[in-house]
């Protein structure tokens, strides 16, 4: 049993982001197709089930890595990321926002169904938005880690300390993934950082972009809820 757990952890730990996204997308697509076959009377539910499974499986696989990594492991893993990983971060954030927008559109159909089906649609919609919120800010947490541990600037010149840094974490110079998630979710909830200092221009710009995206996300959720109330 322990060997099986070790192999499973090794597999999850060594999953590249693209492969992880491909696996989770495949699971979501299969779930959507099966749900449509079984629940053809509500294609909205089929879409939501596929979207929820995609987000949930992605967060679970990524969560295993995040919770298990200490400072050195975080630095080692981040240093192996490809420079083009920024494109995947942008794609992940875009998909979270797009998915939330689609959920908002689906909520307009609540009033067209029976009470039981409407409750099911509302429950799945809330779950999908919640998972998209977690996915959005987890992606920013990963991006902060990549920027912090990046060894060279945009011109290919190595940093004096061997890494960019840009954040000053109390008590450690080798933060873990959880430390970067702390930054991301603190910004998401309060739009401020109390004990972590921002010490580089690039990090300040990234924090600004993160805050604006977060505000846009909340605005879309609010608009979707109001639209659902008006149309139901």
Which residues fall in each region the model found?
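Juxtamembrane helix-capping/reentrant segments at transmembrane boundaries
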Residues: 74-94
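Pore domain of cation channels
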Residues: 179-186, 194-232
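Alpha-helical transmembrane segments and their membrane-interface junctions
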Residues: 95-116, 185-201
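Loop-to-helix transition at the N-terminal end of transmembrane alpha-helices
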Residues: 42-60
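The first (N-terminal) embedded transmembrane alpha-helix
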Residues: 14-38
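Transmembrane alpha-helix/helix-exit interface in multi-pass inner-membrane proteins
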Residues: 129-156
